[in-house]
Amino acid sequence: MILGVGIDIIEVTRVQASCDRFGERFLQRILHPNEIAYCYSHKTPAPFVAARFAAKEATSKAFGTGIGAALGWHDMEVCRKESGEPYVVMHGKGKELMEMRNARMTLISLSHTQNYANALAVLET
């Protein structure tokens, strides 16, 4: 059963501007170290950072909380299977929310171009 759906879109240039202005501090605020390493393993990391930003926003919307006190940036980690399929690992408050809602998984889909990144998240029992 579907418990929630969230979607987000962001301009890659906004993420690039934040990376340029705040550097590592911005990245460490929104991403796990594994996510930073993955994004920066690509020649142009900004679209990959933007996709993870959008994925976390979409996931928080699927929970109905948004990013804030109930669910923070580091409570969600976007990972990839060997096939390339993305998935979300919930930590801390995210894991607690999953248990409180009797949710067993969050499905996500990511897409990005040079200009935009978007994500769709579905919270299921």
What are these regions (language model features)?
Residues 1-125:
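Core catalytic alpha/beta fold that binds nucleotide/phospho-ligands
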